[in-house]
UniProtKB/Swiss-Prot annotation:
GO biological process, one term: positive regulation of leaf senescence
Lineage: superkingdom: Eukaryota
Tissue: Expressed in embryo, endosperm, growing hypocotyls and shoot apical meristems.
UniProt keywords, alphabetically: Auxin signaling pathway, Developmental protein, Growth regulation
Gene name of the record: SAUR36
One Pfam family here: Auxin_inducible
Keyword Kinase in record: no
S-S bonds: none
InterPro entries linked to this entry: SAUR_fam (IPR003676)
Name used for this protein in its record: Auxin-responsive protein SAUR36
Record's keyword annotation contains Hydrolase: no
Family: Belongs to the ARG7 family.
Loss of function: phenotype: Increased leaf size and delayed senescence.
């Protein structure tokens, strides 16, 4: 007979699963113990745990990020603690990424900007928070919040959209 060439992993796995384990006990071993039933189930339990470990290792490998970064791709700076990255700009215009302290979100002026964003995009908006106004208008609101002014009316009018 010709020897089959190929993987021997099937034979190795079956030997590992069905190998007999010896329990070293001092003293008397019962003939009809419940441990014999456990020994019969052990190969299946071994196979199950081996499959679970194999699945976990594949998941870990698939969730790792690739080290490849395209040449023209610029990685975004990480957001510092206590800040949130938002995008300022019109839908069709150029959006700017701005880091805003989280404390600003409680301010009434910023609340008005968020209400405008809700009217424009709604709650089911994919991506980050986008404020639909000009970048210069947003900078004015940001400086007013930083200076401590709590006026609810915009100096340039009610709407910050074009």
């Amino acid at each position: 007979m010709r020897k089959i060439i190929g993987f021997r992993i099937g034979r190795r796995v079956s030997r590992w699963i069905f190998r007999k384990t010896r329990i070293q006990r001092s003293g008397y071993n019962r003939i009809h113990s419940t441990q014999q039933a456990c020994m019969l189930m052990r190969p299946l339990a071994k196979l199950k745990s081996w499959g679970q470990r194999l699945k976990q290792s594949f998941r870990r490998r698939s969730t790792r990020r690739s080290a490849y970064i395209p040449v023209d791709h610029k990685k975004a700076d990480p957001v510092p603690r206590g800040h949130l990255a938002i995008y300022v700009g019109q839908k069709d215009g150029d959006c700017h990424r701005v880091l805003v302290p989280i404390v600003y979100f409680n301010h009434p002026l910023f609340g008005e900007l968020l209400r405008e964003a809700e009217k424009e995009y709604g709650f089911c908006h994919e991506g980050g928070i986008t404020i639909p106004c000009l970048y210069s208008d947003f900078e004015r609101v940001k400086t007013r919040i930083a200076s401590g002014s709590s006026s609810r009316v915009f100096p340039w009018g009610r709407h910050c959209r074009n």
